[in-house]
Amino acid sequence: MNINGRNGLACITRVRDLKEPVVIRPPPSFAIIRDFVVDMTQFYKQYHSITPYLVNAEPPPEKERLQLPAERDRLNGSYECILCACCSSQCPSSWWNPDKFVGPAGLIQAYRFIVDSRDRATEGRLDDLSGSYRLFRCRTIMNCAEVCPKGLEPAHAIERIRLKMSGAREQGGPLDTHPPLSPR
């Protein structure tokens, strides 16, 4: 929802803290279906394009794929995304290129799988994000971080993916040398 000109979740917005009159609108950049219902087809299409699940062809272990605490910590600041689309609907790059730019929500999810030690598709994920529109249309305006109800910073995850694509990828160095993302 767009509440008094700011994207947010109606379910956690405290009305008594808002300036009156309270103006509620559908989120910008999405086509309106009816009233406050918007068409999120393109948003989910971009989300599904990043392969939002672990890819691992190794035979599964008896119980589960374990991670060291440090490996698990690398997921902090990315797995908490609830796909509310507040960030993507506030992002100018998503407005201008909705069919090409993955968007902040999709990219923070891509980062989550790129740094997951249990995933075996990092190179393929990076290849899928290459090109001038999929990842590199982010201009770090930071609207995404400003409106995220979970306090996440998609632009930082996007920057780390860029680093992985450029330097660390050629050197074979891990993206994991950076401290984990953390919610604000």
Residue ranges: model-predicted function:
Residues 22-89, 93-184:
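Ferredoxin-type iron-sulfur electron-transfer modules in oxidoreductases and energy-metabolism complexes
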Residues 1-28:
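Hydrophobic/aromatic-rich structural module bridging two neighboring secondary-structure elements via a short loop
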